[in-house]
């Protein structure tokens, strides 16, 4: 192939004869693309959004990047602000016109890539996700208009939530640090609100005017307005659940005249200790209102152990993720025990005095109390009537199987504690 008919392309760029491979950072095992320079070029048209049509002299072997350079030469628009569309497809810089079957007198469409333009997502309560083209400088009001264009929902019925905050119409996306591919939540503003009650630990009841679409954070602000309690010291409980700031009242099915309970998050937390099976003790800064799940996250931050592999024991009880330290009466300088939940458990046997043998699925990190519960599930014997013996020792409720070196297929002995008896 004669050199004058060859065009070499690398990384979307046509290579110039006088330059070296090093100039283009071409390294070993790089791949160049060879396209043939067709004798004689062709004309194509580029139509802009304003309706203006530009005529360009090109060759089938030109890359899209080359075409953008020609448009820059004619119109002064930088290539990185150009998007070229043909047959409904956005053209990629490194491909050639021939790759897209663009022939003489084809028409391309030029769309300008807005500086700061980006896509964001809007998720509705029904779970539907809408994609919007926006700019950081768009106001919340602009965004609501775009949603109206797509979904037909009037702006005055829309409330947009991001990071647990309701967005105000006059502010911009940049004001809220909303970046590309952020997800906003759309809740509908129900016409007419409702009253709910908030009961404090002192027994005082506060009445609030709210809407179903209010976030928990909004409710905390209303409580602050009435009572002067900062939101970060408030915990709201409904139906036994602690409410999360970013969720709405509707999410929790809180209806008119529902009663929420307000618990104060004590300023200034406390220290607790967590002791591992290796004997290492970790110190954590916590609050009484922290959930067990929060504590496991803090342990993960310090030790790198995933929460789902952690089991926390206090006073012989395994702690449940959704409960708070206060629920278990864990106070400052209490010591929790951390046992690792080994992936995949093991079988052990429990032999009764009648000679019957029960098989149980357990983990080394199970406490003796857990084992007694499993025996109760199988045999109906209340834990307080069970005594479990292994290697001649009576096992204590708060200890784990690992503490007693009970391994797979070990046999424990079950002795019944006689009601009213004393040993």
Swiss-Prot record:
Main location: cytoplasm
Residues annotated as domain Ubiquitin-like: 1-41, 42-117, 118-193, 194-269, 270-345, 346-421
Cross-link (Glycyl lysine isopeptide (Lys-Gly) (interchain with G-Cter in ubiquitin)): 89
Propeptide residue range(s): 422-423
CDD domains (alphabetical): Ubl_ubiquitin (cd01803)
Location of the protein in the cell: Cytoplasm; Nucleus
Gene3D superfamilies attached to this UniProt entry: Phosphatidylinositol 3-kinase Catalytic Subunit, Chain A, domain 1
Keywords from the named record: Cytoplasm, Isopeptide bond, Nucleus, Repeat, Ubl conjugation
GO CC list: cytoplasm; nucleus
Pfam families hit by this protein: ubiquitin
PROSITE patterns reported in the protein's UniProt record: UBIQUITIN_1, UBIQUITIN_2
Glycyl lysine isopeptide (Gly-Lys) (interchain with K-? in acceptor proteins) cross-link, renumbered residues: 117
Presence of the UniProt keyword Transport in the record: no
Single Gene Ontology MF annotation: mRNA binding
Family per similarity comment: Belongs to the ubiquitin family.
Miscellaneous comment in the UniProt entry for this protein: For the sake of clarity sequence features are annotated only for the first chain, and are not repeated for each of the following chains.
Function: Ubiquitin exists either covalently attached to another protein, or free (unanchored). When covalently bound, it is conjugated to target proteins via an isopeptide bond either as a monomer (monoubiquitin), a polymer linked via different Lys residues of the ubiquitin (polyubiquitin chains) or a linear polymer linked via the initiator Met of the ubiquitin (linear polyubiquitin chains).
Protein name per the record: Polyubiquitin
Annotated source species: Acetabularia peniculus (Green alga)
């Amino acid at each position: 192939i004669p050199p004058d008919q060859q065009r070499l392309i690398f990384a979307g760029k046509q290579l110039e004869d006088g330059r070296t491979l090093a100039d283009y950072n071409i390294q070993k095992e790089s791949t160049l693309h060879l396209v043939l320079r067709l004798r004689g070029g062709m004309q194509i048209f580029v139509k802009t959004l304003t309706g203006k049509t530009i005529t360009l002299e090109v060759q089938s072997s030109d890359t899209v990047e080359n075409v953008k350079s020609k448009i820059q030469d004619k119109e002064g628009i930088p290539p990185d602000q150009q998007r070229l569309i043909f047959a409904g497809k956005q053209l990629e810089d490194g491909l050639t016109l021939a790759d897209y079957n663009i022939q003489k007198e084809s028409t391309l469409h030029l769309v300008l890539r807005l500086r700061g333009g980006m896509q964001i997502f809007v998720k509705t309560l029904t779970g539907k996700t809408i994609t919007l083209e926006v700019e950081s400088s768009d106001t919340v009001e602009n965004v609501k208009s775009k949603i109206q264009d797509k979904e037909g929902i009037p702006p005055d019925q829309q409330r947009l939530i991001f990071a647990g905050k309701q967005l105000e119409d006059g502010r911009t996306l940049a004001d809220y640090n909303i970046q590309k591919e952020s997800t906003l939540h759309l809740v509908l503003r129900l016409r007419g609100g409702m009253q709910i009650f908030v009961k404090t630990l002192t027994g005082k009841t506060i009445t609030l005017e709210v809407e179903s679409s209010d976030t928990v954070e909004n409710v905390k602000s209303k409580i602050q307005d009435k009572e002067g309690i900062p939101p970060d010291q408030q915990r709201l409980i409904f139906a036994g659940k602690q409410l999360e700031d970013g969720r709405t009242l509707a999410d929790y099915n809180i209806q008119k005249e529902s009663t929420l309970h307000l618990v104060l998050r004590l300023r200034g937390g406390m220290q607790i200790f967590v002791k591992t099976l290796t004997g290492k003790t970790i110190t954590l800064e916590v609050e009484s209102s922290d959930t067990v799940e929060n504590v496991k996250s803090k342990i993960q931050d310090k030790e790198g152990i995933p929460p789902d592999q952690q089991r926390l024991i206090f006073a012989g009880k395994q702690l449940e993720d959704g409960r708070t330290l206060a629920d278990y009466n864990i106070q400052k300088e209490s010591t929790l025990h951390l046992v690792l939940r080994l992936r995949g458990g093991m079988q052990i046997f429990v032999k009764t005095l009648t000679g019957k043998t029960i098989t149980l699925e357990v983990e080394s990190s199970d406490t003796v109390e857990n084992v007694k519960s499993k025996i109760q599930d199988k045999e109906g014997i209340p834990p307080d009537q069970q005594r479990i013996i292994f290697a001649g020792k009576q096992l204590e409720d708060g200890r784990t199987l690992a503490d007693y070196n009970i391994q797979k297929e070990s046999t424990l002995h079950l002795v019944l504690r006689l009601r009213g008896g004393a040993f």
